[in-house]
């Protein structure tokens, strides 16, 4: 795991993590957040609907970027304050997701 200082960062630098989302991940997230929406927890009902299976919570997926920013790039001590996203496709249990951050601008320190 690489940790970058401000000086190490440059426009175009990319950091990412990949994670295969498991049944246990979805169950843990459901329990922690209280989001028991049937889309995430009821396989029988979900099979009859648009996605044809349970889907992973979108906010669980969005949270993966915290791993990238807080642990990889720039790394420990980093606190990000904004995140914009658009969910283009559903994520299913056992899908592998890549959460990626790229430096698009580097402002002067201070």
Annotate each PLM feature.
Residues 1-79:
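Hot-dog-fold acyl-thioester-processing enzymes
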Residues 81-110:
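Hydrophobic beta-sheet segments that form the core/acyl-binding groove
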């Amino acid at each position: 795991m690489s940790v970058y200082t401000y000086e190490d960062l440059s426009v175009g630098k990319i950091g990412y993590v990949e994670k295969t989302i498991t049944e246990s991940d979805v169950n843990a997230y459901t329990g922690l957040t209280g989001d028991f929406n049937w889309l995430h927890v009821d396989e029988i009902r979900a099979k009859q609907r648009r996605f044809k299976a349970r889907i992973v919570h979108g906010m669980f997926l969005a949270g993966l970027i915290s791993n990238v920013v807080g642990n990889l790039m720039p790394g420990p001590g980093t606190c990000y304050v904004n995140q914009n996203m658009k969910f283009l496709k559903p994520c299913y249990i056992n899908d592998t997701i890549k959460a990626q951050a790229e430096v698009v601008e580097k402002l002067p320190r201070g």
